[in-house]
Amino acid sequence: MRILFVAAEAAPIAKVGGMGDVVGALPKFLREMGHDVRIFLPYYGFLPDKMEIPKEPIWRGSAMFQEFAVYESVLPGTDVPLYLFGHPVFLPRRIYSGDDEDWRFTFFSNGAAEFAWNYWKPDIIHCHDWHTGMIPVWMHQDPDITTVFTIHNLAYQGPWRWYLEKITWCPWYMQGHNTMAAAVQFANKVNTVSPTYAEQIKTPAYGETLEGLLSFISGKLSGIINGIDTEVYNPEDDKYIAQTFTTETLDKRKANKIALQEEVGLEVNSKAFLIGIVTRLVEQKGIDLILQILDRFLSYTDAQFVLLGTGDRYYETQMWQLASRFPGRMATYLLYNDALSRRIYAGTDAFLMPSRFEPCGISQMMSLRYGSVPIVRRTGGLVDTVSHHDPENAAGTGYCFDRYEPLDLFTCMIRAWEGFRFKPQWQELQKRGMSEDFSWYKSAKEYVKLYRSIYGLPEEEETPKPELVLNEAVTNSKS
């Protein structure tokens, strides 16, 4: 199939959140399965510092009474063709800035639609989050191009001002809607990034005022778990950690713990229960819950804590103050560093992720991959990726709690701290987590099933068919 990914982010060149990880990784694995997948991305002003971009565009067009140019390159580290939407409105900016994001990304989306109609015509346009929400509306009347819309985080639905209804030729019955709602209504298929989150957003507690619409279209709504690049993030050969290891050489992992304690200024003690967290410091991630119990937890136990992340200034200040109260037992790094995050995954005993809500989550999969036992709240993708430790039946991969309450989190952390004392059971718990399959190839197969379901095609066999055969099947289904 010919598939065009349209998004505001794509790792490693333009990333703010999890959407960038998906758009930067999934196309690579879909191409390995025989599909012609390409990415359409804004030409941000900072991109020339990160990659090679030709000076001359491959195509020029106009949208919303503005001219634009499209430049062709390749996503670094892959063979995925990358089309960059060039216009001055994106050049001097960060990815998200200013109060005109609705106009900028609607203009970008209109440009992507014009590009698909006039230059490279895909079978499917795969749209990501509110920034691309108008594309399914415009493509709804085109029998040759279908759309898939992925909701990465329903909480961000995008602004929408009245004048956009006029210059985008928005149907009268969509007036007043945001672009997220428009995409949900008009896309051929809608998916979220985990099965549990797909169910949760149909309820008032998680639906962000769209639960009625999402329930109405539930027949075309599904959830597919994100993946991680298991070739890049592999404790067996990761050059950023002190000691590589596998499930068979788990005892070697202790060297990473000692190296991490030395690096971040914690007391070097291999027997201390070391908890890590790599996150954005925002309410969604349960930071308010952590702040309510962390002082008590560190006072009650001999545990250590290391945090890596940035976010709300209030949360940053509170974490700094806690670290100053527990020198040698708590380390706070208010930044993001990929290499340090890997050392935290590889060197901590447990990983804390008590999210208020979590569409999918990547960190818990990374922690499992590197043998750090996750402590999570049962919500969204955390339900689908972490199962509660059951020592009697030698089952489970982490410690889970249900209610978003300080006492519930505290109790769960105490159970993990106590479980850490039983080394044979703890190592078996680590091994089960490290053996889980969170590869992007697994996720890619689910997306292929979703794409094929649009055309009523049967599920693809394990050995992917040649692209030409599949393209012929898609063409026949349209005729």
From Swiss-Prot:
Pathway field: Glycan biosynthesis; glycogen biosynthesis
Leading EC class: transferase
Residues reported in the UniProt entry to bind ADP-alpha-D-glucose: K15
Keyword field: Glycogen biosynthesis, Glycosyltransferase, Transferase
Coiled-coil intervals: none
Superkingdom assignment: Bacteria
GO biological process: glycogen biosynthetic process
One GO MF term attached to the UniProt entry: alpha-1,4-glucan glucosyltransferase (ADP-glucose donor) activity
Presence of keyword Glycosyltransferase: yes
The enzyme's E.C. designation: 2.4.1.21
Catalyzed reactions: [(1->4)-alpha-D-glucosyl](n) + ADP-alpha-D-glucose = [(1->4)-alpha-D-glucosyl](n+1) + ADP + H(+)
Membrane-crossing residue ranges in chain numbering: none
Family the UniProt entry places it in: Belongs to the glycosyltransferase 1 family. Bacterial/plant glycogen synthase subfamily.
Cited function: Synthesizes alpha-1,4-glucan chains using ADP-glucose.
Protein name per its UniProtKB record: Glycogen synthase
Record gene name: glgA
